[in-house]
Amino acid sequence: MSATGPFSIGERVQLTDAKGRRYTMSLTPGAEFHTHRGSIAHDAVIGLEQGSVVKSSNGALFLVLRPLLVDYVMSMPRGPQVIYPKDAAQIVHEGDIFPGARVLEAGAGSGALTLSLLRAVGPAGQVISYEQRADHAEHARRNVSGCYGQPPDNWRLVVSDLADSELPDGSVDRAVLDMLAPWEVLDAVSRLLVAGGVLMVYVATVTQLSRIVEALRAKQCWTEPRAWETLQRGWNVVGLAVRPQHSMRGHTAFLVATRRLAPGAVAPAPLGRKREGRDG
């Protein structure tokens, strides 16, 4: 997606009406975009700068901007459930996904998290996404390619079980698991992740949360896992009339963070809790 300059042919743009409703279209010469508030000629948008306002055939005004990554993710065609921006942002931050990083992703889904990972690692980094289901992999491929215009050079999509990965030992800096049974691939992840590397796990249920945390502890090659969830609530602000919105984005998932220990190292047991196999 372009970031600056006038809108050009073939580019995706976002129209926002007076009620805040958003529409996305790809600019094609001679085409028209139809809404319930009238049509908008693509030719009227091509060549404009971002932040311009156009008028529909019915006289309605629309703000024209390039869609942000969050806009694209929330409007792109879905197959599997997407990872919401509030969780993707924390995965990138808590997982310390840095420019140039080699990131392993298990569970490409619809490609929502993949896009955030690709943005974070930049052109010098690499994202390797494993997806067992061919239909999910195709959804991810279409959505990622739709955002970039083509499959990015620094993205590798593998339709296979991560447990069967033939990647070299210690070949990734960070790993992210978004799958039903992440505990089943911990042996593969511990082999592939560098010492000190961060593992982030995304799970939806309390049962999954308990099982993955206990599995990490049992392996005894990870730091003590941290687990949390995030609830997001918007606020309405009009002068001094400030109040929370009636609806909120509540539970979407639990996130778990841990780091790979050096071979043979044993982390100190957390105070206040005995660890089976370490403290007797």
From Swiss-Prot:
<dbReference type="InterPro" id="IPR029063">
    <property type="entry name" value="SAM-dependent_MTases_sf"/>
</dbReference>
<dbReference type="GO" id="GO:0031515">
    <property type="term" value="C:tRNA (m1A) methyltransferase complex"/>
</dbReference>
<keyword id="KW-0949">S-adenosyl-L-methionine</keyword>
<comment type="similarity">
    <text>Belongs to the class I-like SAM-binding methyltransferase superfamily. TRM61 family.</text>
</comment>
<dbReference type="GO" id="GO:0008033">
    <property type="term" value="P:tRNA processing"/>
</dbReference>
<keyword id="KW-0808">Transferase</keyword>
<dbReference type="InterPro" id="IPR049470">
    <property type="entry name" value="TRM61_C"/>
</dbReference>
<dbReference type="GO" id="GO:0160107">
    <property type="term" value="F:tRNA (adenine(58)-N1)-methyltransferase activity"/>
</dbReference>
<feature type="binding site">
    <location>
        <begin position="110"/>
        <end position="113"/>
    </location>
    <ligand>
        <name>S-adenosyl-L-methionine</name>
    </ligand>
</feature>
<feature type="binding site">
    <location>
        <position position="161"/>
    </location>
    <ligand>
        <name>S-adenosyl-L-methionine</name>
    </ligand>
</feature>
<feature type="binding site">
    <location>
        <position position="131"/>
    </location>
    <ligand>
        <name>S-adenosyl-L-methionine</name>
    </ligand>
</feature>
<feature type="binding site">
    <location>
        <position position="136"/>
    </location>
    <ligand>
        <name>S-adenosyl-L-methionine</name>
    </ligand>
</feature>
<comment type="subunit">
    <text>Homotetramer composed of a dimer of dimers.</text>
</comment>
<dbReference type="InterPro" id="IPR014816">
    <property type="entry name" value="tRNA_MeTrfase_Gcd14"/>
</dbReference>
<dbReference type="GO" id="GO:0030488">
    <property type="term" value="P:tRNA methylation"/>
</dbReference>
<dbReference type="GO" id="GO:0005886">
    <property type="term" value="C:plasma membrane"/>
</dbReference>
<keyword id="KW-0819">tRNA processing</keyword>
<protein>
    <recommendedName>
        <fullName>tRNA (adenine(58)-N(1))-methyltransferase TrmI</fullName>
        <ecNumber>2.1.1.220</ecNumber>
    </recommendedName>
</protein>
<dbReference type="Pfam" id="PF08704">
    <property type="entry name" value="GCD14"/>
</dbReference>
<comment type="function">
    <text>Catalyzes the S-adenosyl-L-methionine-dependent formation of N(1)-methyladenine at position 58 (m1A58) in tRNA.</text>
</comment>
<dbReference type="Pfam" id="PF14801">
    <property type="entry name" value="TrmI-like_N"/>
</dbReference>
<feature type="binding site">
    <location>
        <position position="178"/>
    </location>
    <ligand>
        <name>S-adenosyl-L-methionine</name>
    </ligand>
</feature>
<keyword id="KW-0489">Methyltransferase</keyword>
